[in-house]
């Protein structure tokens, strides 16, 4: 007999994280989406994986993820409702062997579908797994101050990253590889998925100008914390600029010393010699 999936750690983690993202104002209405790669061992504790509820076609090639299981937020679903009604707002899916569809094993009980950003998520998982086999989470949200920065700050990866590093001491330690930035593109398309996944090969944070941010990590906490750290730096930057601008900041020499202390290396070329 399988256990009650409502007791699964992965369901509780997803419910807690979506609630926090909504509480922070980063996922208004049905904004934002999360995909969580699950191990088959943890899935079979709660579900009979041979019992397919329905099969949902995909418009891109997911063959590299064939057979893998994911917990995915639903299309058009509000993060504020996940904790109260997980089975309506979430789904456990398995990628078909040919990579052209996903099998729904649990959830979306009102007939819902996985997030419309599934192509961007799956492409990002493929990219991250190619460089980090332990990657499990891809998270998208509309972090307020990071979003605002894309209207007022130079949109080059080096300068955007340097500003974030200079705003909070922990930033270099948390994301020494910096942030990636793609052009503005229509969401929910393969094009934006391809652009995001290409950046994901070198970065875990990808800025979508005038839209939001993508983060990737080994766990829900790590991924949330990654975005949270960058967003805090963006908030500090916003406050600093409203107070008259930067008069002093963490220097490049101090950033180098920070990296040495915590055994991280800033992305090559991002610090001045």
UniProtKB/Swiss-Prot annotation:
Transmembrane segments: none annotated. Binds 1 zinc ion per subunit. Its cofactor is Zn(2+). GO terms for biological process: pentose catabolic process; rhamnose catabolic process. It is found in: Cytoplasm. Disulfide bonds: none annotated. Keywords: Cytoplasm, Lyase, Metal-binding, Rhamnose metabolism, Zinc. The keyword Zinc applies. GO terms for cellular component: cytosol. The active site is at 117. HAMAP family: RhaD. Catalyzes the reversible cleavage of L-rhamnulose-1-phosphate to dihydroxyacetone phosphate (DHAP) and L-lactaldehyde. This is Rhamnulose-1-phosphate aldolase. It comes from Listeria monocytogenes serotype 4a (strain HCC23).
